[in-house]
From Swiss-Prot:
It comes from Mus musculus. Residues 1356-1449 form the Fibronectin type-III domain. This is Myosin light chain kinase, smooth muscle. Residues 1486-1741 form the Protein kinase domain. Residues 306-320, 1085-1099 have a biased composition (Basic and acidic residues). Sequence repeats lie at residues 856-883, 884-911, 912-939, 940-966, 967-985, 990-1002, 1003-1014, 1015-1026, 1027-1038, 1039-1049. Calcium/calmodulin-dependent myosin light chain kinase implicated in smooth muscle contraction via phosphorylation of myosin light chains (MLC). Also regulates actin-myosin interaction through a non-kinase activity. Phosphorylates PTK2B/PYK2 and myosin light-chains. Involved in the inflammatory response (e.g. apoptosis, vascular permeability, leukocyte diapedesis), cell motility and morphology, airway hyperreactivity and other activities relevant to asthma. Required for tonic airway smooth muscle contraction that is necessary for physiological and asthmatic airway resistance. It catalyses: L-seryl-[myosin light chain] + ATP = O-phospho-L-seryl-[myosin light chain] + ADP + H(+); L-threonyl-[myosin light chain] + ATP = O-phospho-L-threonyl-[myosin light chain] + ADP + H(+). Residues 255-329, 920-1120, 1212-1257, 1435-1469, 1789-1809 are annotated as: Disordered. It is an enzyme of class 2 (transferase).
Amino acid sequence: MGDVKLFASSHMSKTSHSVDPSKVSSMPLTEAPAFILPPRNLCVKEGATAKFEGRVRGYPEPQVTWHRKGQAITNGGRFLLDCGVRGTFSLVIHTVREEDKGKYTCEASNGSGARQVTVELTVEGNSMKKRDQPVLSKASGFPGETRPSIWGECPPKFATKLGRAVVKEGQMWRFSCKITGRPPPQVTWLKGNVPLQPSARVSMSEKNGMQILEIRGVTRDDLGVYTCMVVNGSGKASMSAELSIPGLDNASRLAVRGTKAPSPDIRKEVTNGVSKDPETVAESKNCPSPQRSGSSARATNSHLKSPQEPKPKLCEDAPRKVPQSSILQKSTSTITLQALKVQPEARVPAIGSFSPGEDRKSLAAPQQATLPTRQSSLGGSVGNKFVTGNIPRESQRESTFPRFESQPQSQEVTEGQTVKFICEVSGIPKPDVGWFLEGIPVRRREGITEVYEDGVSHHLCLLRARTRDSRKYSCTASNSLGQVSCSWSLLVDRPNLAQTAPSFSSVLKDSVVIEGQDFVLRCSVQGTPAPRVTWLLNGQPIQFAHSICEAGVAELHIQDALPEDRGTYTCLAENAMGQVSCSATVTVQEKKGEGEREHRLSPARSKPIAPIFLQGLSDLKVMDGSQVTMTVQVSGNPPPEVIWLHDGNEIQESEDFHFEQKGGWHSLCIQEVFPEDTGTYTCEAWNSAGEVRTRAVLTVQEPHDGTQPWFISKPRSVTATLGQSVLISCAIAGDPFPTVHWLRDGRALSKDSGHFELLQNEDVFTLVLKNVQPWHAGQYEILLKNRVGECSCQVSLMLHNSPSRAPPRGREPASCEGLCGGGGVGAHGDGDRHGTLRPCWPARGQGWPEEEDGEDVRGLLKRRVETRLHTEEAIRQQEVGQLDFRDLLGKKVSTKTVSEDDLKDIPAEQMDFRANLQRQVKPKTISEEERKVHSPQQVDFRSVLAKKGTPKTPVPEKAPPKAATPDFRSVLGGKKKSPSENGGNSAEVLNVKAGESPTPAGDAQAIGALKPVGNAKPAETPKPIGNAKPTETLKPVGNTKPAETLKPIANAQPSGSLKPVTNAQPAEPQKPVGNAKSAETSKPAGKEEVKEVKNDVNCKKGQVGATGNEKRPESQGSAPVFKEKLQDVHVAEGEKLLLQCQVISDPPATVTWSLNGKTLKTTKFIVLAQEGSRFSVSIEKALPEDRGLYKCVAKNSAGQAECSCQVTVDDAQTSENTKAPEMKSRRPKSSLPPVLGTESDATVKKKPAPKTPTKAAMPPQIIQFPEDQKVRAGEPVELFGKVAGTQPITCKWMKFRKQIQESEHIKVENGESGSKLTILAARQEHCGCYTLVVENKLGSRQAQVNLTVVDKPDPPAGTPCASDIRSSSLTLSWYGSSYDGGSAVQSYNVEIWDTEDKVWKELATCRSTSFNVQDLLPDREYKFRVRAVNVYGTSEPSQESELTAVGEKPEEPKDEVEVSDDDEKEPEVDYRTVTVNTEQKVSDVYDIEERLGSGKFGQVFRLVEKKTGKIWAGKFFKAYSAKEKDNIRQEISIMNCLHHPKLVQCVDAFEEKANIVMVLEIVSGGELFERIIDEDFELTERECIKYMRQISEGVEYIHKQGIVHLDLKPENIMCVNKTGTRIKLIDFGLARRLENAGSLKVLFGTPEFVAPEVINYEPIGYATDMWSIGVICYILVSGLSPFMGDNDNETLANVTSATWDFDDEAFDEISDDAKDFISNLLKKDMKNRLDCTQCLQHPWLMKDTKNMEAKKLSKDRMKKYMARRKWQKTGNAVRAIGRLSSMAMISGLSGRKSSTGSPTSPINAEKLESEDDVSQAFLEAVAEEKPHVKPYFSKTIRDLEVVEGSAARFDCKIEGYPDPEVVWFKDDQSIRESRHFQIDYDEDGNCSLIISDVCGDDDAKYTCKAVNSLGEATCTAELIVETMEEGEGEEGGEEEEEEEE
């Protein structure tokens, strides 16, 4: 189904809504658009700038368009549309006006399909709502106003309809329909109004997107109307169909149907974020009253009144005989809209909530609509809500709404076919039908498009479909009642014709013409695809001529021939297959009269012709540093002038920008592009006849390494009062760490103003606004930038004026000022001391700040909207999760922040300081010992509004004083105070003894349910504090539905003023404070008792509250009943926990869940779901903290019911010494059970607690040690290690396992505090790893530091060699430097000497290790030498080459390096079976010469065999363990089986202690790809075939021996020498034997070349190597990598998806055989890949390379690929895909956090059955070879000071080998990972402990302990938690009172 649009129109307004189109079947290798980052809804102030932005992916690149009210938005004026790189796009609206508000639709489309997302712009006016305006509110299950969803979303839609069913008794019947919507809707089937339950006869299922209801053995009882109801967070829809049995009595059928809903219909409610005018809602579960929306509601009531109905009238289903107005949608689905008959201030129950009896009663009194369809009051209908009145029957017969009886369907046709779209339309008056293509009307065009009508059918006919007709089509039908539309797609495919090169069937003929005559040249050309024809005159393009090419005939028309027109005319025809040309000579005979000729010629010549571009610009994407040339061809008369512009500014010719002109060709050359050169380039050409321009976008891409900035915790909008101080806070991350910019209303904040302060604490940034003034209000933007990208977040600061004083006691206020239907009490309303509530509500359109924590209640009457908010949160998690591949292989992203996925669910309150503004630092009043013993119930006072300085005898007439501005520096970092400083009159009670339960303010337990948290015993009586006496308590609000229960304000002084606060965070155990005395005790937590309380909470009748005298209306319907109750559950830790129950109620109940009294909400870990009447809680992996009492409470207007169950979670590892649960479970804001165990051995701490016993003897610790250092040669170096522990401690420095002795260059100084090693002047031999070893009698520790001495490189090794000597040229080749000086060699300087001049001169500079020397003279001899160059300088020269003369060939030396290649003849190879020689040293048999290279394995040296003088390569390994030696022996064993000319041979091996040497044949030509990019190498497809044939031969032989290579990549394909094309495969270190191996799985490979089955940890085979060959071949022919991403994770994700293509222009020159060869190797299913034998028989490799055409291929892409690959390399030749833990778990804690559940991750431990498997996995991970080292910390954790509610993070880096296992401790107790404590440990040894939602109980010392088989290491730091409390001050900024009597 394509796009479906619903339109509702009247004379006042027209609204539309679009649903996501489903994909049309796409062509191969294409991808339909998908929004990676959808645009978000915006709320901005009038006059500000609004920016919608997002990111889309798809192939081809999608085109993004924006629509509003059905009209496309174009660039210009205040609207700016922009599409950036990598799918980013934006819509910017400058100077936003009121009329800009509303919905905007963003559509991304390409040839594969289209995708839409709808967002909303809310515009806030500059003035706040008038406070004296009477406002009405209505209780409802939905909030009257919530913030718009931040994600674009789609309400549910029906893509197909339910058909009416006529079925015989006993048969089976099936209803089916297809639905769409985002998030995916929940589906419920109903019969009548009763949800259907699965049974033996009835089943409900989903298949391929179709929802299916099956009824087997239909009986008469099954008769009736069946409804499919779909609901998501954006709205709901339903469709009904009737099941009937033929022959049944009509009367009985009518009786049955009379009680049901009409069929078929769709009932729909869409609340896309903001519900603005509920009076227009057609239907909802709890039918809303017209007062729900603020000020406009009262005006609307007059139109909604029904004079005939004195009592409130029910919203009810219209009986069948009452005509209805309907809007029809595609598939004849109907939205039924019925008039609302309501009285002012009346409650209107929901449609669909009545019993059949009630429905039958309504049949007797059909509704008479009193609401005219043209009523102007309906102009406010918003979004997707439609309304139309019920028209009287008489008028209804005359006019009906338009509807489609049949609709056009999407089609896929071949180019050239005829396409017909047909629809049938009905309606009275007869509808007008319009056809549209992409929103543009389609008209009749002769021979192309026909539009006609045939009776009731309307036809659109495309006579010859073309590919450009592949678009989205729509049809609208409209009459006076309204309009309906439908849409569909057409896909036109090109026929798959065999492509042929152009050819001429008739050619040009010579001709003779007379001057002034017209003549035509004509020829016929054919070819597939159709050739492009170009005309040339004497080899130059013809500028002033008219040429046409139609139906294969090409013509050139020349008018008024001139003598200049004589010459050779050529017609050039070309297509993708080739080109062909034909020529003819035209002779122009001059006329005799010269004067006459000149007279006639003059006007012809002077006739001006406007410029035209024969070739324009096209968009370019290049890498930073590339050279760019943009070329255009322009013609015109007179010749046009040309200028170039960049982003509208003229480009001046300079050193960087050059202009070139050659005839009509003009070029702009940029020598080296930089990122700032990105932009739009325009070429303008003009002459006297006109002007023309062409433009293109140049994008300069930078290779970035790092992470784009992002928000760990986003800031949130603030509502404040004048004079208050405000904090806006966020936590950020990014690599490199981003810079932070603060802006208000688009302008940067000026630091000179002094009105604000910017604070930073680690990654937390806070903006402090002191003494807020009106000009501080506005939209604040936090902009984060680093070199990878940028990110921003906007919040608003809104101000309320302080309300006037409260009315006297007992009097009801005239109105509830400022109320808006949203439901919450404003932040700063003041009331009198008797408790009269004066709420202050946000102005309309502002809404409340969006909450992510269900417990965080922002005011007294905030409505419960958890279901809505959870849905949005689920959308956010789902959409981001779909795109996040970071966990693909169980890897952690190496940033120093929590991963984005983890943070999606950290409540935003963790970084929210707004509620803490007036609080002092919590006194830390007792010692740590006492705190550990008592584990006090810490109380959260964030919502406390009572002030410390309240007078003991308050005066009723006097309003309480305003809060003073606190000093926020003391708030954030102030000192802690002793108990005496906060006397009994404090607003906060601290250190309550364990077991005491605080008293809530009043007894509103069911309605605000203030419950003790944790394991507080319910029977304990709370203790009142001070002299508090709660004389009045909060009262339940009359006429209020349970879904909006009253939240009492914790710690409010009941006898004082109630101050509701927006940012209050109650739901914590609280105690009354101040001058109050407890009148009665609180009820035990967990008992939901509704108490009548007496408190003057007065509001207008029918509004928020009601006084005790008022009557509550009688409830409608029945109270909820649990049909299926919760059952006790027992699960093991890590298993899935699922709790389900079924609730029957009328009207539908609101269901809330709680665990141990704490309300549950949907998070990443816990999912609350509803399917019809069934409610569930599911936890994918249960933890011990999930145990406890689960309670489900269902409420509706008629009552409530509850059921509960006990859940037990078995610990995976229960410590015997676990302390009593009470000790650590009473943490505020958490219901976590104990997560701390103890470990038998005491933790060694750096800083013991003050009252601990005398310090015990300690092993040595290295507490300070330098990082790795890099110094220039000649500079001094100091390495200092600071140590601690029991003396005496001995320190010694080691290098290469030998102790360093002092010398004239090196000094060592040892002292009690540490040891210092000083190198006076660093030289190259000082490079290496230095180890500090410290020892005492209790043990030893060591730490390592790498020292790199950078310098100019060593001279190139060996002697330069001349080869390929010709008459005047030769090829010079040489080895690279044996040491590069610590920085890569950038180039080589070649120097020359001859026998005549006898002076060394610089000849050339080149990057490779060979150079073709030209223009040599035969009469002299030459010598050469080479210098290497790096960033630090130029090396000394190499050895000099031998004297060489051109014109003769030197005698060939024995060294194979210098042997010219002969492709035909393989040299004799000396094959040997090698056994490891342990008797002799390698130096006994070979002379060891210069180093040739090094790698992770060791080093390679040139060896000369002493007996024969043959040259070999020696590969020297360091192998310390038996396992390492076995691994090398296995490689030698495998190489003994691989005797083949294309495989490098091992000829000898030696073992001596930890050294193993393999002697290999030398391959000196370098890596294959390096050879290809040499300047003297010409790359053609012929060379590619030669290389691939050799690779296939070599791998074929390996496979025949039962071996797989598993590391095929360009680095392991070596050229035999530098002149030929012979290659050899090397490096069999990862090779494995497949024979007898069973099912072999591996965990290693190079991401770019590894096969999908390796990543997915599936069995491998010989075909695994074939995938790698396919990747190598793809890169070889194109220079492009099919799967390379910006990092390894992205690359691996690309490989697993196995999507690639040949779309790049690089493949234009590549033959189809080559593409077929690659295609048959890059198959995701390994069974479908070619094997080596099939490869060698493939037509491509069978081609005759001697005689085939050799078309030169570009090497530019290959050079860029090689540069990028070098940049991406991390230094290890093989990167491990997975890293596994090698040790057992300590205290139930895994040392490395395992994969977070990627289904393809090989890291799940279940896959490794034994310790041998683990060891094998480690071996396969190919970790760098290094000696075993005890654990030590190269970076230790540091003390932290954080504010309560934020997140804390300890970071350290752990070194050691084998990899240490890690355990964390809180004080003396080991920490088990949970949702509160998260532990990250990555491959690089970075380990983090993240504590989310920090509270006072987390204030402790934390220790990280690292253990391996050689020892252990620890480091310790302290976490200080600062708890904020309310402060009090007088106006004028007086100091807060410290103490009161």
